[in-house]
């Protein structure tokens, strides 16, 4: 039934393409870190002709035990957004996670698959520098919302498929412990055409009519028995990224036999708008999911 309704729900979202996430230039408060943490800001993790991407690291003081790590990827339809607008990391600080908060190339800088390449390079950076950072390479989680959710899914689901690992540290084992997908895009082609998403078409650029290419940058393409566990959260009134994208992902994960948890927030829009009180509930449920996996 969910699959039957998918196309209808996507078509209903056509009126929402103008609501795709955008940001205005403004100052954001710096992330407040605990006393037993230190930070490294604007660390260059990937570069190439005409670009240089940076990340922020919030690092727990070293102990005899290695720490888990979580990579956070901001949203914004691949056209806008910034690591500087991100926050809400306290649940992870309280549980000893290193937090890696990244920038990546926007559509105006480079079309698909550049953002995927950058997100993969952030993972490679953590893997390559794990010893110096005091983290466990087997307990790295990747997380994002909206377009960031899409990039988190791509980063983790590619596993050791290195097709997009350009301008990265040379790391063979690119598997992650888990993925946190918050209202992310799972099928770029469907979102571009059923929902008439300007963001998706702009990101695809001159390949926007190439369905085969769009599938190569769609998380659904890479699901398999070795895929990492995935936590999913989505509002059932999301008119920007229809919840059917998450239903399809969740159903396929269950079919394959991959551990997953889908949190559906009633009456919530994109980014859980209209139900912000559920953000805390989501964080708690994410931590339970990661605890069950032994990540921390």
Language model features with spans:
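Bacterial Sec-dependent N-terminal signal peptides
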Residues: 1-24
């Amino acid at each position: 039934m969910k699959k039957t309704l998918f196309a209808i729900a996507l078509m209903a979202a056509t009126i929402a393409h103008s609501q795709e996430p955008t940001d205005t230039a403004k100052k954001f408060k710096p992330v407040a870190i605990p006393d037993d943490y230190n930070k490294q800001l604007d660390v260059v993790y990937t570069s190439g002709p005409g670009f240089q991407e940076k990340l922020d690291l919030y690092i727990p003081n070293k102990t005899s035990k290695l720490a888990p790590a979580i990579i956070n990827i901001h949203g914004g339809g691949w056209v806008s957004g910034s690591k500087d607008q991100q926050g809400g990391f306290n649940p992870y600080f309280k549980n000893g996670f290193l937090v890696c908060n990244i920038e990546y190339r926007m559509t105006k800088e480079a079309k698909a698959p550049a953002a995927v390449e950058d997100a993969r390079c952030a993972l490679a950076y953590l893997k390559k520098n794990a010893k110096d950072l005091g983290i466990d390479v087997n307990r790295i989680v990747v997380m994002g919302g909206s377009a960031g959710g899409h990039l988190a899914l791509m980063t983790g689901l590619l596993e050791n498929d290195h097709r997009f690992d350009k301008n990265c540290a040379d790391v063979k084992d690119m598997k992650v412990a888990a993925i946190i997908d918050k209202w992310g895009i799972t099928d770029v082609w469907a979102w571009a055409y059923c929902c008439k998403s300007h963001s998706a078409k702009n990101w695809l650029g001159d390949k926007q009519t190439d369905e085969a290419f769009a599938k190569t940058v769609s998380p659904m393409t890479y699901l398999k028995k070795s895929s990492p566990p995935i936590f999913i959260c989505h509002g059932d009134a999301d008119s920007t990224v229809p919840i059917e994208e998450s239903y399809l992902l969740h159903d396929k994960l269950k079919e394959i036999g991959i551990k997953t948890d889908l949190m559906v927030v009633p009456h919530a829009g994109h980014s859980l708008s209209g139900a912000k009180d559920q953000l805390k509930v989501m964080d708690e449920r994410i931590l339970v999911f990661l605890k069950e996996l032994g990540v921390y």
